[in-house]
Amino acid sequence: MSGCLPCFGSSAKDAASKDSVKKELSAKDGSVTQSHHISLDKSKSRRGPEQKKELTAPKEGPTAHIAAQTFTFRELAAATKNFRPECLLGEGGFGRVYKGRLETTGQIVAVKQLDRNGLQGNREFLVEVLMLSLLHHPNLVNLIGYCADGDQRLLVYEYMPLGSLEDHLHDLPPDKEPLDWSTRMTIAAGAAKGLEYLHDKANPPVIYRDLKSSNILLGDGYHPKLSDFGLAKLGPVGDKTHVSTRVMGTYGYCAPEYAMTGQLTLKSDVYSFGVVFLELITGRKAIDNARAPGEHNLVAWARPLFKDRRKFPKMADPSLQGRYPMRGLYQALAVAAMCLQEQAATRPLIGDVVTALTYLASQTFDPNAPSGQNSRSGSGPPFIRTRDDRRSLGDGSSLDSPAETRSRLGSPATHKNSPDYRRRDMVREVNAGSEGGSETGGGSGRKWGLSDLEGQESQRGSPASVGRSSRGTPRNRDLDRERAVAEAKVWGENWRERKRATNGPGSFDSTND
């Protein structure tokens, strides 16, 4: 084999190149050391904006101290059978990915060979090696090592046998079963947990910047992991609200404020997650020029449908063939709509999204069971009624009003870390923009939520509502949606507290992986 691979022979040039990359990694590590610190313990780093921060590996988890291996090009060529076409797993703007087996350990791996003329250059290569060497989570792909022989740049990852989420959503062959509803919710919850780790556990937070269905890889049992961190950026620290950078990413997934201004925030990732979640619900691509005019862009197609819950069933993936819980569909679309708010400040935090999706993923759905047996199994989130005196939503489900939620949870607490305090703070945060004469219109200060919106939708078309329909301006509808964001945050926080109260301290570990 060495005869057909002349670059196998070691040379001073290759050795110098490898040393150069190692120096660049060390230099990049050192340069970030002076300004940032990546850690899982945020409390120890909040001593003031002038504190110097160091880039260190997280101290938690069994893999926290594992360093990336260095491989020779010979080793990786042998692992992939000289990069034969039958070993090719996929190809993108950054290069090709091959399946291989390491001769030394027998481990099955995925080898990404960067295209020297592609979109990912040496800087992105270094960023990915650095990020994945430091950040470890069950929902982030594991980096095994890298190769920097000569001008070759290769990354070695753990092998994900089920491919990418994109492979299971779009352009399915006739013999391939589509994902069922429960699996879709589980994948969404896992991907959100990976994003939550980057946003909330790393310090400073890491902005992924390239969240899309092709970058969510699936392992056994459809366990999702985020991959491809070449575009990741360290988030704002101190008093900064954003980081300014050139616009990168994939069309159809980029948040509008980032695409227009280059100002990147954690909420930019939340928007991208909303697009992926909408793909999971609808089965549509983020951008699909093969569809009819007006349906090319997934978000643009969905926005008017979000305003009328009677059209929600039309948004479900036809390949599901109606095998999904109606209430679960409504709640999933509500979460997607909140993530896709045009104003970044009104999008939920990824931690609240994790709470909502963890609940949705926990609701098992049997497509063969009678509809009544799938509706109210287990305890719902706090704003979902569990009593019989519920307002019907047409599918046997209903939502609590904010007052009923508060009465069931007891008197409001005043401590700043209590759920009630944070709930009021989140409501004020969303209402502040509407009451101050913002572009979404004025507001009365009433805490409207998802229950109010669904109640209005259920009454639409009645004689009493005919006269009011002319007053439902787009500005008011935007205000309603903003208030729905606040109520969703209330739901997430209250449900989390109920779980803690029911199972004891530390029992709600599903959001702390």
Swiss-Prot record:
GO terms for biological process: cellular response to chitin; defense response to fungus; innate immune response; positive regulation of defense response to bacterium; positive regulation of MAPK cascade; regulation of defense response to fungus; regulation of innate immune response. GO terms for cellular component: plasma membrane. ATP binds at L89, G90, E91, G92, G93, F94, G95, R96, V97, K112. This is Serine/threonine-protein kinase PBL27. It catalyses: L-seryl-[protein] + ATP = O-phospho-L-seryl-[protein] + ADP + H(+); L-threonyl-[protein] + ATP = O-phospho-L-threonyl-[protein] + ADP + H(+). Belongs to the protein kinase superfamily. Ser/Thr protein kinase family. It comes from Arabidopsis thaliana (Mouse-ear cress). One of its GO terms (molecular function) is ATP binding. The lineage of its organism: Eukaryota, Viridiplantae, Streptophyta, Embryophyta, Tracheophyta.
